[in-house]
Amino acid sequence: MEKQNETAESSLKTYILENTPARIRERYAHLKDYAQMHTFGALDADVVVLDTETTGFSFNHDELIQIAAARMCNGEIVEWYVTFVNPGKEIPDEVAHLTNIHDEDVADAPDPDTALTGLVDFVGESLVVAHNVGFDRTFVTKRAAGATLKNNIWIDSLDLARIALPRLNSHRLLDLVRAFGGADSTHRADDDVAATCLVYRVLLAAVANMPAPLVAHIADMADVERWNSVYVFKELASSEAAPYSLFKSRKAQVAKVQADLFGAAELRADQEAELDRAKHATSRMFHGKHFWRTTTQQHRNACSSWRCCEYSIIASFRE
């Protein structure tokens, strides 16, 4: 067990940015254990983690070739829905090479409408979690058979990673899995779902370990209808948390460091770097207008919401 912990910590070090303070490295290193020892109420009592594989990236011209979904209750996978999907067209060579899904695998598979009908029945009214959620949500809801899933809350684990783990040098699913000691994904949808199940609970732990006033501050930035992922922050936010104040946060941390015989000047420089990281993480989540022109009106609304969120975050940092 000790050797496994050392290996996990070594993997995590590979993905943490240089000059990250030791206390932050230590906090990141304990997140997986924290996730294993805690539950997170409605956020993991009954959620469906989902991934899809497709013939390409075009929402207009490409089709599903695999759907995988796992129902997770308090950290345990209790039920699966996995199916190949016949796209009605040839699978491009590059996609077959990446996913190891070939034309013969999908030849006798259900068509997209049949597969999506099964998915809708499986998901029900549960929370849905996916990594880079816009891609999967668009592909499963663009047909009438899956359209009702637009009514579910979709949580993007990529959003959570960028906000709660800004000191990682990558927030790709594969890198997050490697950082926290999971098994490598094969780019099959079912493997990606298993990976996302692990990562999602680590990310819940990461948000739960953020300062409660900051979680509450983010929770107030948007409605769930406009930015589904804010549901995580609303659930974890303390109802009695005081408004977030950077000045008070700095003052408290300076006092702690002084008590440990460190210099306050060193801490201030460190915190300025952390603010830059947070602003950068927010800007990475905002893709810009050129991206949203090719997507749905819901995505355009989310873009507008994120612009407001970005300004709000930056303003709070300047207190």
Ranges and model annotations:
Residues 127-144, 168, 172-240:
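Acidic, Mg2+-coordinating catalytic module of metal-dependent nucleases/exonucleases
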Residues 156-166:
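Short, flexible loop segments at boundaries between secondary-structure elements
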Residues 2-39, 201-311:
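Acidic two-metal-ion nuclease catalytic site recognized across multiple nuclease folds
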Residues 3-153, 166-187:
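Conserved non-catalytic scaffold segment of RNase H-like nuclease domains
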